[in-house]
């Protein structure tokens, strides 16, 4: 097959691993910067051009689209879909997952347990918003934040009010969430490929922090997940219509709670921790689904 990887930086670990895994299985691979793609939208002859040339047909496209370029990145992916390329995660699913509020609403509607969460835009009554999630301690987030950026733990009511007031000054959407103290700065990242949790790690926050993101200096170890956690991870990925997802779970006293569903999970931390060839599993999933029947169905 001919496979395109949409990534702004082909030297990143995840992109390199996916390229290597595809080549090892005999596929032709090209890494494309989605921001350098430009499109002819025409009912008779739609096309995608890249750095002065018209791109050929790709059997499959692997999107590695960062949150900062979600709008144009998903537009480029959508054009590949229109031309009959199989997407490892559809553009609409990626856009949906990047919207934290919509994601939580969809997960809650499917009965998937979450931390108690409130969301507001410049709330007039900060006190009521805090009461909505059970009071302090609580976590205050910017809805648009990623990798632990724009996330603050407010240990007292006064601190929570101060943080919310500061975020209000940014004219931003504010997400307020109960703090799961018993998680002790740890969470479980389940990597879902298709209908299987292929790997799971426990991530631990660095000393003095409560955010377990590896990008923030957290540590990781192999996690043994329960059957309930496995079921929740798969259900969360299905709810978001993602074939590949990183599902983050907190272990609370009342049971596992889904924190987030990531549509473009990094592979470095989880592959190096578990030794699982996740990139290879992603390529094999593509091989099973990027079929001629798919191209006929989509018009490619």
Curated annotation (Swiss-Prot):
ATP binds at residues 141, 178-179, 187, 211-213. Residues 104-287 form the ATP-grasp domain. Binds 2 magnesium or manganese ions per subunit. The gene is rimK. One of its GO terms (biological process) is translation. Mg(2+) 2 binds at residues 260, 262. An L-glutamate ligase that catalyzes the ATP-dependent post-translational addition of glutamate residues to the C-terminus of ribosomal protein bS6 (RpsF). Is also able to catalyze the synthesis of poly-alpha-glutamate in vitro, via ATP hydrolysis from unprotected glutamate as substrate. The number of glutamate residues added to either RpsF or to poly-alpha-glutamate changes with pH. This is Ribosomal protein bS6--L-glutamate ligase. PANTHER family: RIBOSOMAL PROTEIN BS6--L-GLUTAMATE LIGASE (PTHR21621:SF7), RIBOSOMAL PROTEIN S6 MODIFICATION PROTEIN (PTHR21621). Keywords: ATP-binding, Ligase, Magnesium, Manganese, Metal-binding, Nucleotide-binding, Protein biosynthesis. Mg(2+) 1 binds at residues 248, 260. InterPro entries: ATP-grasp, ATP-grasp_RimK-type, ATP_grasp_subdomain_1, RimK, Rimk_N, Rp_bS6_RimK/Lys_biosynth_LsyX. Pfam families: RimK (PF08443), Rimk_N (PF18030).
């Amino acid at each position: 097959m001919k496979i395109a990887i949409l990534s702004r930086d082909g030297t990143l670990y995840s992109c390199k691993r996916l390229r290597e895994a595809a080549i090892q299985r005999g596929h032709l691979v090209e890494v494309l910067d989605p921001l350098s793609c430009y499109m002819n939208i025409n009912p008779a002859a739609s096309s995608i051009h890249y750095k002065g040339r018209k791109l050929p047909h790709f059997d499959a496209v692997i999107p590695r689209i960062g949150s900062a370029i979600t709008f144009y990145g998903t537009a480029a992916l959508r054009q590949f879909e229109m031309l009959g390329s199989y997407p490892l995660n559809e553009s609409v699913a990626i856009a949906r997952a990047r919207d934290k509020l919509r994601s939580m609403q969809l997960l809650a509607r499917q009965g998937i347990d979450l931390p108690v969460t409130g969301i507001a835009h410049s709330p007039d009554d900060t006190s009521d918003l805090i009461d909505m999630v059970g009071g302090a301690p609580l976590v205050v987030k910017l809805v648009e934040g990623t990798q632990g950026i724009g996330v603050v733990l407010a240990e007292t009511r006064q601190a929570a009010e101060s943080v919310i007031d500061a975020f209000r000054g940014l004219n931003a959407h504010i997400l307020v969430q109960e703090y799961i103290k018993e998680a002790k700065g740890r969470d479980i990242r389940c990597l879902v490929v298709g209908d299987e949790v292929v790997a799971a790690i426990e991530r631990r926050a660095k000393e003095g922090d409560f955010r377990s993101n590896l990008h923030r200096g957290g540590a990781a170890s192999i996690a043994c997940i329960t059957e309930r956690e496995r079921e929740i991870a798969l259900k969360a990925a299905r709810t978001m219509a993602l074939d590949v997802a990183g599902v983050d779970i907190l272990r609370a006293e009342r049971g596992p709670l889904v924190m987030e569903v990531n549509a473009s999970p990094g592979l470095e931390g989880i592959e190096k921790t578990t030794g699982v060839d996740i990139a290879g599993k992603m390529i094999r999933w593509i091989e099973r689904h990027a079929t001629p029947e798919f191209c006929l169905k989509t018009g490619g």
